[in-house]
Amino acid sequence: MAQDMTYARYLALDELLSAQKPLSDRHDELLFIVIHQTKELWLKEILHEVALALKLIAGGDVEPAYKALARVSRIQTVMTLSWDILATMTPADYLSFRDDLGTSSGFQSHQFRALEYLLGLKDQSFLKFHTERPEALAMLKSALESPSLYDVAIAQLPRHGLTVPDAALHRDFSQTYVPSPEVEAAWLEVYRDPKRYWELYQLAEKLVDLDDALVTWRHKHVLTVERIIGGRPGTGGTDGVGYLASTLRRRAFPELWSLRTKL
């Protein structure tokens, strides 16, 4: 009953605070665990908000989705700032327990990959890293095969009298989105007449906020990893900083960036 509820019970603090299980006796390992567990909690909330935004936009309720999208970008800012905390760990601190991590890596975060899928950055090759976790794999497959945030945003363009090719509206959503000159032209009309298309204009800018924040997070990730391990390979088998740096050019909403050159 509500009158019996306590702060600790409501937040399941006993379970939450016992979930940090360092494998070594090194002081800094707890920070490493807390940073990554906190990231996963924030990703859970981000996925919750993106799911709401997807539902609202797909149903034509674009303006109510702004709040969810704004909340996501605020959370992204907090996640980016958290790299500064991890950066207090020196190379010696990290190397003192790195071997205990084995092949575990943030590269294997299914929630981060689900977020990429829901934004429109689809890549089926990541599914193979989650075959031993059926629930995580099912979540990823659902996100992969469903329309992304960008797909439902593009679908709003014809509802406002803008021309979009059928191939952009009815496609295999599990495949990587290929930028379209026609889609860019439609968004360009929105940006050239924001008063007329205010709802779409605001939606587009909210999406760019998300993309901007994601790239900023990636960039800070690269710098933090380089500061701590330099050019060493990542624990997950990637080439570490080299792989992370290669992701900096990714854009979830490509035409919303490219159109700016033509304004």
Swiss-Prot record:
UniProt key word Iron: yes
Residues holding heme: 221
Protein residues bound to substrate: 32-36, 94, 98, 235
Enzyme class label: oxidoreductase
UniProt function note: Heme-dependent dioxygenase that catalyzes the oxidative cleavage of the L-tryptophan (L-Trp) pyrrole ring and converts L-tryptophan to N-formyl-L-kynurenine. Catalyzes the oxidative cleavage of the indole moiety.
Sequence similarity: Belongs to the tryptophan 2,3-dioxygenase family.
Name of the protein in question: Tryptophan 2,3-dioxygenase
Annotated gene: kynA
